């Protein structure tokens, strides 16, 4: 608020969005709660982000998705004078006409300029928000007349995305990974003139911070750079940092004996990490391992059924994995294996 975050909010944001450590994230959240209780509107905006799902916060952070509560908090933060709340409310469709009338800013532009000032002074999260304003087209709320000069969306992107690129890079330099996906889209579009050297430098730097990007970087090393073993090491690193997909990918390699000696016991441990992290493929593998009695696991049909059902009902379960689970569950229910 008033052009800068409180020390508590600034520290909490770094803990929640740059540590990828659940204990530190809990500490950061407690700091936000305390600040919010003392009337800090920015704290409310960041608390709201915690409940808006994995597009807004690390999926393994331990926050439950609560859209209704998040909307109320985001709108309240905007009406209390948080420029962060205003910009985030636009992105999450929470800047309703009534909220816009009630906020103490004369316009969206005024709120944007406050965040821009913080970004220019080096705040990484504000750099990210400024980049988003350009990337998603919200800059046309800042300068509505600019819309007249663009023929279509691509014409706008050709102007705005190179600007967004610069702000995303500044956010990366500040240790924030949140804009990486958008940055990759800019590179793929060819509109941002991002060289391979710059792209790979940021990719490696952010992979050292984010478990999710670490997994993706492992895939990049394996498929694009032809370094399968280095990619595996990145999968294992990501798994240790809490990324379920990294754990599953590494487990698959150890199970198949690709680039390394086959190690079913280690594969099982990695699949269990993936399963406990909520990954449907990992849950299926744990069901299969219990069904067959693989590795150090004794055959346990009840456990197998439990894992197969978790995978089957997982909202992110693919059709292929769902079909595999259904086949094994059919056998279990038909034969009374682990279902009685």
Name each model feature, range by range.
Residues 1-8, 25, 37, 64-67, ...:
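Inter-repeat boundary and helix-capping residues of tandem alpha-helical solenoids
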Residues 3-4, 18-19, 38-40, 53-54, ...:
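Short helix-capping/linker turns of helical repeat alpha-solenoids
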Residues 13-17, 46-58, 89-97, 129-141, ...:
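Hydrophobic face of amphipathic alpha-helices that form TPR/SEL1-like repeat modules
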Residues 35, 77, 116-118, 171, ...:
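Canonical positions in the second alpha-helix
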Residues 53-70, 97-110, 136-163, 260, ...:
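Short coil/linker segments at helix-helix boundaries
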């Amino acid at each position: 608020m008033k052009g800068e975050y409180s020390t508590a909010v600034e520290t909490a944001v770094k803990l929640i969005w740059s540590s990828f450590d659940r204990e530190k994230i809990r500490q950061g959240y407690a700091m936000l709660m305390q600040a919010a209780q003392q009337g800090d509107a920015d704290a409310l905006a960041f608390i709201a982000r915690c409940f808006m799902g994995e597009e807004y916060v690390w999926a393994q952070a331990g926050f439950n998705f609560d859209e209704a509560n998040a909307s109320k908090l985001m709108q309240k933060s905007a009406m209390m004078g948080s420029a962060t709340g205003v910009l985030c409310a636009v992105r999450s469709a929470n800047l309703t006409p009534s909220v816009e009338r009630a906020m103490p800013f004369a316009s969206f532009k005024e709120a944007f300029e406050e965040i821009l000032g913080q970004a220019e002074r080096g705040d990484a999260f504000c750099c990210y928000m400024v980049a988003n304003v350009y990337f998603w087209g919200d800059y046309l709320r800042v300068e509505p007349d600019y819309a007249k000069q663009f023929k279509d969306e691509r014409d706008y992107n050709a102007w705005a995305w190179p600007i967004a690129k610069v702000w995303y890079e500044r956010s990366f330099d500040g240790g924030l990974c949140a804009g990486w996906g958008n940055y990759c889209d800019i590179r793929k579009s060819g509109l941002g003139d991002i060289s391979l050297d710059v792209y790979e430098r940021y990719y490696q730097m952010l992979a050292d911070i984010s478990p999710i990007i670490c997994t993706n970087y492992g895939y990049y090393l394996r498929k694009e750079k032809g370094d399968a073993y280095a990619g595996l090491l990145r999968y294992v690193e990501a798994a240790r940092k809490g990324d379920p997909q990294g754990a599953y990918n590494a487990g698959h390699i150890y199970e198949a004996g690709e680039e390394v000696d086959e190690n079913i016991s280690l594969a099982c441990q990695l699949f269990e990490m993936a399963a406990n992290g909520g990954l449907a493929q990992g849950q299926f593998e744990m069901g299969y391992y219990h069904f067959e009695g693989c590795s150090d696991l004794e055959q346990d049909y009840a456990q197998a059924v439990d894992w197969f059902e978790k995978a089957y009902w997982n909202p992110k379960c693919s059709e292929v994995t769902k079909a595999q689970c259904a086949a094994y569950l059919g056998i279990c229910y038909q034969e009374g294996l682990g279902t009685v």
